[in-house]
Amino acid sequence: MKKILLLFMLFSSVTFAQIAVTHFNADWNSANDVSWFMGLEDCKTIGHTDIAKDAAAQAEHKIAVVPTIIIFKDGEEVARFQADLSFKMLATREEVQDEISNQLMSDF
């Protein structure tokens, strides 16, 4: 029984560690922050990256519009959700959460 519990705990931590999500925005666009971002489940939410203060992150991830949400699996980008021309996020929490779930299920 201990082995099963240990395996379950290990599997859970490995699964959650595989998916990371980052929210990119800028202070000048803080009115359009994605308020539901930190409530995403089954992933590690990296938090908000201000591209005005972190130009290297902007260049590395090719952020062209803010806000942008990127889902990473094992360190590689697997999905991207970007704002429209009015700098507002079009994707809903449900759409982003569905993509996280799809990425987790793709391993099975």
Where are the regions that the model predicts?
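A short beta-strand-turn-helix
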Residues: 14-19, 55
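Non-catalytic, surface beta->alpha helical segment in thiol-disulfide oxidoreductase systems
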Residues: 71-108
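Local sequence-structure signature of Cys/Sec-based thiol-disulfide redox active-site neighborhoods
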Residues: 17-47
